[in-house]
Amino acid sequence: DIDDDMWKFADQDTKDALLYGIKSGDIWLNKIKFDPEGNRIYGNVCLEVYLPSRGTCLLQHVNLGACTLDDLQEAFTTAMSQLCDLHGRTGVGESGEYLTPSVDRQVGLGMLGLSNFLRRYNITYKDFGEALRLVNLGHSANNEAGCAAVALDIAIFEAAQIARQNDMVRAFAIAPTASCSYRSRDLDGFTCTPEIAPPI
C-alpha cells in the first residue's frame, strides 16, 4: 500500500528493491481502490479483479470467436446464469478462510476472441470502436460494425440484468487470462485472441 508520500520519502535502496520486485514479477503494481460503499478492495494476483479482503473470484468467459451476431445474447445470458447459479454452491465460505457467498456477492464474466469475431464480419477495430461510441451515446451506426456493437450491448445488458436479479455487486471482469484463449478456437478453427486484444 504505497502512496505518493511513501514513495517520495522512501530511500533509493527501497525504491530500487521495489522496482526490481515488480520487474521480476514478485511484486504486483496495483492501484489502491475502494468499492462504492468506501470499503477497501484489493487486486487479485491476476490483477483482473478487485476483491474485498478474503473475497474470492469466480470467473468465466464468453468466447466471442465462437459466436455469431445472433448467438451473443444467448451466450452472455447463459454464461451469467451459470456463474450466478454456481456462486452459492462453491462451498468456498465453509472453511472460514474466505467470505461466504452471502457476503461476497460478485462474479466475473469476461470475453475473449473479439478480434476473431470482428474478422468474421470484416469489421476493423476502428469501425467497431466508433460504433460502440455511438451506441454508448444512444445512437446507432447503420453498418456491420453498428450491428455488432448493438448486439454486444444488448447481450451485456441482459447478462447484467441476470446479475442484478441475483444481487451481485459485480458481474464483469477482465477475464480470462491469455492461457484460456490459446485453448479456445473460433468458428473457423483459428486460435482465439486473449481478452479483447488484437492479433499479434
Annotate each PLM feature.
Residues 1-200:
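Long, C-terminal-biased catalytic regions of enzyme "large/alpha" subunits
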